[in-house]
Amino acid sequence: MAKQIQAIRGMNDCLPEQSPVWQKVEQILRQVVASYGYSEVRMPIVEQTHLFKRAIGEVTDVVEKEMYTFEDRNGDSLSLRPEGTASCVRAGIEHGLLYNQERRMWYMGPMFRHERPQKGRYRQFHQFGVELFGINGPDIDAELIMLTHRLWRLFGISDHVTLQLNTLGQSSERAAYRDALVAYLEQYKDQLDEESQRRMYSNPLRVLDSKDERVQAILVKAPRLFDHLGEESLAHFEGLKRLLESAGIKYEVNERLVRGLDYYNLTVFEWVTTSLGAQGTVCAGGRYDGLVEQLGGQATPAVGFAMGMERLVLMLETLELNADIRPAVDVYLAMVGEGSEQAGFQLAERLRDALPDLRLMSHCGGGNFKKQLKRADKSGAAIALILGETEVQNGEITIKYLRGQAEQQTVTVDAAIALLAAKGD
């Protein structure tokens, strides 16, 4: 026997038993973003490597350690996309979507990072992202957060997530703060872990989110970014907080929240949970007003967020909030006796014409009545439609309820259609 070929580590199959949860999540995401006026954009999975180096920053974990990068047959360096914002901005610039206009876009699809696979973190993962271009104020930042808050309510997880907020100010303010932070950290250089020592000069703000307890103890007396912010940056942040408070959305200000990508400025936020253990971030985003110009477009204010869909699905499963997911099959059609197979397939097509949303599985492969009912029960269907010789002769169908105590009944095909339609409402 030939050796089995298995999926790449950290890149998982979504099996038929799992897909209904994903479909439900995707349906809710699509409905909500549409209600806020966003349109879908679909970008390629592979991009030129320098797109991500310019957008995310060359001295970041994503670019330095995690990207899947390869050289194609033309000698060009290409990468599987590690996130969606850079690709979305590139598409907007390339097709003239961002020139002097407001644009609201969303996307959903696989991303790739070479990380150590663990619960909630995979090498191929699916990301849902929302990006808005052309609006400056804190009002749109607040609306994006309200959008995510609506999602949590619809998913039933509002009580299990917490909003963390921070502001990174403008680049000139961060530069002054960066100098002050480096000067402070240099006093404790020998006490920092190896990763923080490396980041201290290349990307010192990332030291703030170090998980090392010794580093966190050193940071207690470190300079504060808030002390280096100008009036406009502080006013933007205060405006955002007021809008969230008026909307009844609770938040925590986390001055250590800096995000792992270089393009953010002003508002940054994360929705975190304790339901997933170490992988606590469900959704994250912020403002990136300089990125469009950085990638060759006209200066354009922008803000967005992204969420890892695997983590969201895992959270729903962990909290057992996926019980109402519709099964893959609603109705199973069993056919027994002479003439039933031909009549059965005609009936199945008639039912599909009349009830497009009905999930109907017709029995194939032969077998007696008992075997077919066993297959019907195993399919997860709530109802079995039974078509035997008598039903064929009389133009009727027998309805057997596989879940619950309702009695079996034999009715006309029109009556069966009406009954199934009523149950679908």
UniProtKB/Swiss-Prot annotation:
The lineage of its organism: Bacteria, Pseudomonadati, Pseudomonadota, Gammaproteobacteria, Aeromonadales. GO terms for molecular function: ATP binding; histidine-tRNA ligase activity. PANTHER family: HISTIDINE--TRNA LIGASE, MITOCHONDRIAL-RELATED, HISTIDYL-TRNA SYNTHETASE. It is found in: Cytoplasm. Keywords: Aminoacyl-tRNA synthetase, ATP-binding, Cytoplasm, Ligase, Nucleotide-binding, Protein biosynthesis. The keyword Cytoplasm applies. It catalyses: tRNA(His) + L-histidine + ATP = L-histidyl-tRNA(His) + AMP + diphosphate + H(+). HAMAP family: His_tRNA_synth (MF_00127). Homodimer. Belongs to the class-II aminoacyl-tRNA synthetase family. The gene is hisS. NCBIfam families: hisS. Its EC number is 6.1.1.21. The keyword Calcium does not apply. One of its GO terms (biological process) is histidyl-tRNA aminoacylation. This is Histidine--tRNA ligase. Its main location: cytoplasm. One of its GO terms (cellular component) is cytoplasm. Pfam families: HGTP_anticodon, tRNA-synt_His.
